[in-house]
From Swiss-Prot:
SUPFAM superfamilies, sorted: Lysozyme-like (SSF53955), Periplasmic binding protein-like II (SSF53850)
Family listed: In the N-terminal section; belongs to the bacterial solute-binding protein 3 family.
Role this protein plays: Murein-degrading enzyme that degrades murein glycan strands and insoluble, high-molecular weight murein sacculi, with the concomitant formation of a 1,6-anhydromuramoyl product. Lytic transglycosylases (LTs) play an integral role in the metabolism of the peptidoglycan (PG) sacculus. Their lytic action creates space within the PG sacculus to allow for its expansion as well as for the insertion of various structures such as secretion systems and flagella.
Signal peptide: 1-21
Catalysis performed (reactions): Exolytic cleavage of the (1->4)-beta-glycosidic linkage between N-acetylmuramic acid (MurNAc) and N-acetylglucosamine (GlcNAc) residues in peptidoglycan, from either the reducing or the non-reducing ends of the peptidoglycan chains, with concomitant formation of a 1,6-anhydrobond in the MurNAc residue
Subcellular localization(s) per the UniProt record: Cell outer membrane
The name this protein goes by in its record: Membrane-bound lytic murein transglycosylase F
Length: 518
């Protein structure tokens, strides 16, 4: 029998062509064999979130927020870039998962039995309760029993809808509410303080942050107990992303990174003071504009708004302030400190601010390098208040009591112990008013949060006013001015009149405001 002569070159070419044709349909090519592999092949972790002071926000174009920072670190952990998509409300977030437009939802979402039926939860990292809010001065409900849809509105996709339904079925049959499909919880809280809405429901942490800028928002009652907060991902047979999240959070917890991030965003305390916050925000409007140039001039290693918060805590922005112990001026410097800094007049605002910054920089330079960069300021401020030697004692005490002396979250818990004899008697530098240093730093952080949020709100309002003006008075060509389609001369005369009389300018008036008055 004659042997068949095989043309290996022909077979090789044929096999290559067939492989090229079928390659995209092969499972390990057309798509990665698991979700983590797909993310790494794409080189991008897609995270959807909402814009709030806690989850994700931007200042001067730089993103920040608890969920953003954690998501960025998780992307780094996977070795990919982070892509953030901001949605308006929770319902839109879950649409992103359903439509395959997101790998993760990182937006302070609450774990509950309904959500986990359709979505995969990740590890929990803090907890919140759902609370009913109202405007100070308005009627405060003590129960949900008589609330109607005309009074209570909640955001779409809000976890509390399930809780409300349960309460309606079990306790309050007359309870009713409305869901606003176009607004998130933050916008609904704004509607409450503007008098457009009687009540809404939001989580306790979001409310606490909102009150720093809008102290007129008040909590009427708790709707739920504490609920864990988590991230969500698609629910299917692929658990690789869930496993990676678990490993990531375990690592963050073990090395203390998670505690430091939570301290940064959640460690400001929840002891909200309505009068103090309102007084501070009034001072922001009345006093800060004159001092802002000085804060901006001398703030070097820190943000000027933090410097302003420090000065307010020291003197309430009073250059003539004097304490019973003899400290004076905007930054409340002692006579000896002022002399060492070359300050000739402690009541001169510029000299005081300049000296205070230099003294704070000296404290910053003494903080050990082992302390994380973004926490060094809190150690320095505590030292600024009670003396650097006592800060050394606080760190030593933290280490002795099995805490981390480089973690502000751990050290601040030990500060009040510096005034208790069983502890200070065993320390190198003895008694110190550690509880005052603790309150000092916490107050500064609260003022900083209020100031940053309030200035952002002002900027937002100015932008909206400018956009409204552009809509009310659109640009027209010179040839159109003579056709009386645009009241140009009237606009100029009214603007000039308003400027000269210092009355509210048209630049910040809505179209038709005069019509409403008539």
């Amino acid at each position: 029998m004659k042997k068949l002569k095989i043309n290996y070159l022909f077979i090789g070419i044929l096999a290559l062509l067939l492989a090229v044709a079928l390659w995209p349909s092969i499972p390990w090519f057309g798509k990665a064999d698991n979700r983590i592999a797909a993310i790494q092949a794409r080189g991008e972790l897609r995270v959807s979130t909402i814009n709030t002071p806690l989850t994700y926000n931007e200042i001067n174009g730089k993103p920040f927020g608890l969920d953003y920072e954690l998501a960025k670190q998780f992307a780094d952990y996977l070795g990919v870039k982070l892509k953030v998509t901001v949605r308006q409300n929770i319902s839109q977030l879950f649409d992103d998962l359903d439509n395959g437009n997101a790998d993760l939802l990182a937006a302070g979402l609450v774990y509950n039995s309904e959500r986990v039926k359709n979505y995969q939860p990740g590890p929990t990292y803090y907890s919140v309760s759902q609370q009913l809010v109202y405007k100070v001065g308005q009627y405060r409900p003590r129960t949900l029993g008589n609330l109607t849809a005309e009074q209570l509105t909640v955001a779409p996709g809000h976890v509390v809808v399930n809780d409300l339904q349960t309460l309606k079925e079990t306790k309050f049959p007359e309870l009713s509410w409305k869901v606003d499909d176009k607004k998130g919880s933050a916008e609904l809280m704004e509607d409450v303080i503007e008098g457009k809405l009687d009540y809404t429901i939001a989580d306790s942490v979001a409310i606490s942050l909102f009150q720093r800028v809008h102290p007129e928002l008040a909590v009427a009652l708790d709707i739920t107990d504490e609920q864990p907060v988590t991230w969500f991902s698609p629910l299917d047979g692929d658990n690789t992303l869930s496993a990676a999240l678990l490993d990531f959070f375990n690592e963050m917890n073990e090395d203390g990174t998670l505690a430091r991030i939570e301290e940064k965003y959640l460690g400001h305390g929840d002891d909200f003071d309505y009068v103090d916050t309102r007084t501070f925000l009034r001072a922001v409007d009345a006093v800060l504009p004159q001092l802002k140039p000085l804060f901006e001039k001398y703030a070097e290693e820190i943000d000027w708004r933090l410097l302003a918060a420090i000065a307010y805590q020291e003197s309430h922005w009073d250059a003539q302030a004097t304490s019973p112990t003899g400290v004076r001026g905007m930054m409340m410097l002692t006579k000896n400190t002022a002399q060492s800094l070359g300050i000739t007049d402690r009541t001169d605002a510029e000299q005081s601010i300049s000296g205070g910054v230099r003294y704070l920089q000296d404290m910053m330079s003494k903080v050990p390098e082992s302390v994380p960069e973004n926490e060094r300021i809190w150690f320095a401020l505590a030292a600024y208040n009670m003396g650097y030697a006592h800060m050394l004692d606080a760190r030593a005490l933290t280490a002795k009591t099995k805490g981390n002396p480089d973690s502000w979250a751990d050290v601040k818990q030990r500060l009040p112990l510096l005034s208790q004899k069983p502890y200070y008697s065993k320390l190198t530098y003895g008694y110190a008013r550690g509880h005052e240093a603790y309150a000092y730093v916490e107050n500064i952080r609260k003022y900083q949060i209020s100031l940053v949020g309030y200035l952002q709100e002002k900027e937002k309002q100015a932008t909206e006013a400018a956009m409204q003006l552009a809509q009310d008075y659109p640009a027209v060509s010179p040839t159109e001015l003579g056709k009386e389609k645009f009241p140009f001369l009237s606009f100029l005369s009214q603007s000039s009149s308003n400027y000269l009389t210092h009355s509210p300018s048209l630049l910040f008036s809505r179209k038709g405001s005069e019509e409403k008055q008539n």
